């Protein structure tokens, strides 16, 4: 008798973890953003309809300019992710009156010690209205959201269901020089009150 097939999960056939990381990052940042009035607390998390709309906006921009849908399968590089984060800021400005400020603290650096990355993430994530997106190198090739740094672990909000990542796994304990997380693939997100002139910056 043929073996019962295993169900495919999100990510098995698509490379949309970058899009999911942006959506999850915004959801987490909204969770801790200080709303001015208590009655707005219930509006911290976007509705399913809002999340679907944001997902469509990001997906449309990802494939724009392509005569095929390969970006959906092949995934998102750091340049594309940065562009999509800017589009997300436009969406937040329209729907929430907020702007999403994006920083790449180690952009252009070939190597950053694990402890320095962890310290930077930890200091950033204790602030309200923040999240971080990391790109994990091959063989995983995956974008994920960091919500907290705890001891020697990164606590995640991950589209593939992973709950944490050990620093020893991706840092100095890794055989490759830069570890599993390249400095260019670290994005710090912060929500602020919207100003039309405010854009995502490197």
Where are these predicted regions, by residue range?
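Active-site nucleophile-adjacent alpha helix/oxyanion-hole segment immediately C-terminal to the catalytic cysteine
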Residues: 1-67
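Conserved active-site-adjacent core of cysteine acyl-enzyme catalytic domains
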Residues: 59-181
């Amino acid at each position: 008798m043929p073996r019962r097939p295993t169900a495919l999960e999100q990510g098995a056939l698509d490379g949309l973890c970058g899009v999911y990381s942006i959506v999850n990052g915004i959801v987490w940042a909204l969770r801790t953003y200080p709303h001015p009035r208590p009655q707005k607390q219930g509006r911290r998390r976007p509705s399913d309809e809002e999340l679907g709309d944001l997902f469509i906006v990001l997906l449309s921009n990802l494939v724009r300019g392509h005569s095929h849908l390969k970006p959906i399968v092949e995934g998102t590089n750091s340049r594309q992710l940065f562009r999509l984060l800017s589009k997300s800021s436009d969406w937040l400005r329209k729907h929430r009156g907020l702007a999403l400020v994006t920083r790449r603290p180690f952009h252009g650096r070939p190597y950053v010690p694990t402890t320095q990355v962890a310290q930077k993430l930890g200091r950033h994530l204790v602030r309200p209205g923040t999240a971080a997106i990391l790109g994990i190198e091959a063989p995983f090739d995956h974008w994920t959201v960091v919500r907290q740094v705890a001891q020697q672990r990164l606590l995640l909000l991950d589209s593939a269901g992973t709950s944490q990542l050990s620093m020893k796994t991706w840092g100095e304990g890794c055989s490759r020089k830069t570890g599993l997380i390249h400095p260019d693939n670290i994005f710090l997100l912060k929500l602020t009150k919207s100003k039309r002139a405010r854009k995502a910056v490197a």
